[in-house]
Swiss-Prot record:
Residues 76-249 form the CRAL-TRIO domain. The gene is SEC14L6. Pfam families: CRAL_TRIO. This is SEC14-like protein 6. Residues 252-383 form the GOLD domain. One of its GO terms (cellular component) is cytoplasm. SMART domains: CRAL_TRIO_N (SM01100), SEC14 (SM00516). SUPFAM superfamilies: CRAL/TRIO domain, CRAL/TRIO N-terminal domain, Supernatant protein factor (SPF), C-terminal domain. InterPro entries: CRAL-TRIO_dom (IPR001251), CRAL-TRIO_dom_sf (IPR036865), CRAL/TRIO_N_dom (IPR011074), CRAL/TRIO_N_dom_sf (IPR036273), GOLD_dom (IPR009038), GOLD_dom_sf (IPR036598), SEC14/CRAL-TRIO_domain (IPR051064). It comes from Homo sapiens.
Amino acid sequence: MSGQVGDLSPSQEKSLAQFRENIQDVLSALPNPDDYFLLRWLQARSFDLQKSEDMLRKHMEFRKQQDLANILAWQPPEVVRLYNANGICGHDGEGSPVWYHIVGSLDPKGLLLSASKQELLRDSFRSCELLLRECELQSQKLGKRVEKIIAIFGLEGLGLRDLWKPGIELLQEFFSALEANYPEILKSLIVVRAPKLFAVAFNLVKSYMSEETRRKVVILGDNWKQELTKFISPDQLPVEFGGTMTDPDGNPKCLTKINYGGEVPKSYYLCKQVRLQYEHTRSVGRGSSLQVENEILFPGCVLRWQFASDGGDIGFGVFLKTKMGERQRAREMTEVLPSQRYNAHMVPEDGILTCLQAGSYVLRFYNTYSLVHSKRISYTVEVLLPDQTFMEKMEKF
């Protein structure tokens, strides 16, 4: 039995009836207390009554905190409306709405410097509620229940800037909230135009997805436009995505429905930097340097760092060791990222590097040019690994 309305086993029927009885006190506050809605929570917790009830009650608290009953009337800040790259456009053959997220043209740092994290998350929750409303409208129009949505992630232009830690943490928080509060609404998450870097990005967020959600991720290869029409009819796909749909003025991107984002103008910035917490603090003495070594086991891994200095600027560069097991001077190693001085005492620095070969990479902080003052640095360094399954799939494209 699928666990869907009309296809329940006797034990599932019994669980549904008991579940409804257990949550009588909140039924009237639910957005739609019918069997379809209740079964979403039971399915998400494999019909475990206590876990399903706990999940639903936590969601009710979430609804109050986010004021979801009124969120469709809420207007996001202008910068979010203009540059948060997403939109609803078209339906699949079963009537499910299609939501686009144009990740490759998103400017995560610009958005987080121009709006609060809560405003950006709230805009995402608003999109979820818009999708649920569209499902209801489709149900009325088609005379059958439409419960699920298709998500298309466009990754053309995905780059190292998209692995910026605060931006990834925002995405992790969104997926965590999505799993907890919008169970069983995703039919497929289709990824198109994915560069190899996607395997690293996916590995950073997959732990915030349920196993069921991860199974719904579909990566389309070079022939993605034709493959996409197997999921969605061409007349429901923008020309930009291989279909025939255009805006009334003929625009192939359907800009009236999908926001493609772009770089956020600095005129929108509310602050100069996003506050970060660092894992390590060390002193770099006058005329000396500090080496932070990281072992990279295979090509395709990514080094990500953030640092700030106190007491003046600090020099920084990245090197690859030529001999294992011993400390080397800078001139004895291969320079991977050219060394230069950074005003990290004024503006914290962050950076990302794709490691093209295995080996020991050294992040070198240097104060060799200062004969009087020592510097104090705070830093975080991480090695980001690609998801091996997706990396193998993408290498076949």
